[in-house]
Amino acid sequence: MKGEWTPPDVRDTVIDFVNEWSDKTEISAARLIRWIGIRQGKFYDWRARYGRVNEHNGWIPRDWWLEDWEKEAIIAFHAAHPLEGYRRLCFMMLDAGVVAVSPTSTWRVLHAAGLLRRFGKASKKGTGFVQPLAPHEHWHVDISYINIGGTFYYLCSLLDGCSRYIVHWDIREAMTEGDVEIIVQAAREKFPGAAPRIISDNGPQFIARDFKDFIRICGMTHVRTSPFYPQSNGKIERWHKSLKTECIRPGTPLNLDDARRIITGYIAHYNNVRLHSAIGYLAPKDKLEGREKGIFAERDRRIEEARQRRKLARQAEREEQAVDTALLAAVN
């Protein structure tokens, strides 16, 4: 209801609704108003005008309002002097005899035309980014804590952004910048032709100069996510959550070797068997190797075959019922 007039009948209906249910339920009117989503000041203003039509005069032109030609002149003058601020622009127009307006009116006209904040850039936080279209374009890397027998260890994983395939992983008692380099290099050795963009958070291992040099020497690029914004690396954050909820906590590893065994089995299941909702309920291995079109086509074929089978079965059942009905009628 913000920015527009509320019709009187709607306004009075809201008043009647609040009064009626406040009496029936003994819930305060203030709470009902809050649930409805109306400010208390607006509600009590409506109640004071109950039964009367709207008498707003906000859209009646005032004598001091700028005329259309004046607004057009301000916009045209701004286009001729785009680097000037609105205050300087105002007095330049005043001295040049273009229009006689105040700085506030100049600001309103330029703001309504969307001509202010010429150097401002909208934040891209929360808008996402261009998703990879093929495997090995993006590799997400992150480090997470794993509780093993009451001791916390470091788990570092690399996840392919397109297929969600776990490229490589390792558990260590410490996870320095050098350890991360070893894990990334092991992943590169599995896929020698890959030159992905490495996406990470701003952990100390990833902002180190040696890690930057390693990425550059390997022919890859590196992108760090926005600080205090883990959603921008949400793919691998979600992987670590799945690992903990589906593998670590139910499996309860007793020591480091036991944890490696359990995680190895789970990752084999995750990569090759488990259907991933973000990629059309495919196994990451199938997506990685480009088998998704054949799988989708086979699924559609099976669904269509089942529909046709059910259709033919119902037709046969109806025909059989029709024959039985005809025979029964002939006997009678």
Could you describe each region identified by the protein language model?
Residues 200-202, 208-215, 222-245, 255-264, ...:
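RNase H-like two-metal-ion nuclease catalytic core shared by retroviral integrases
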Residues 94, 99-100, 104-159, 165, ...:
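Mobile-element integrase/transposase regions
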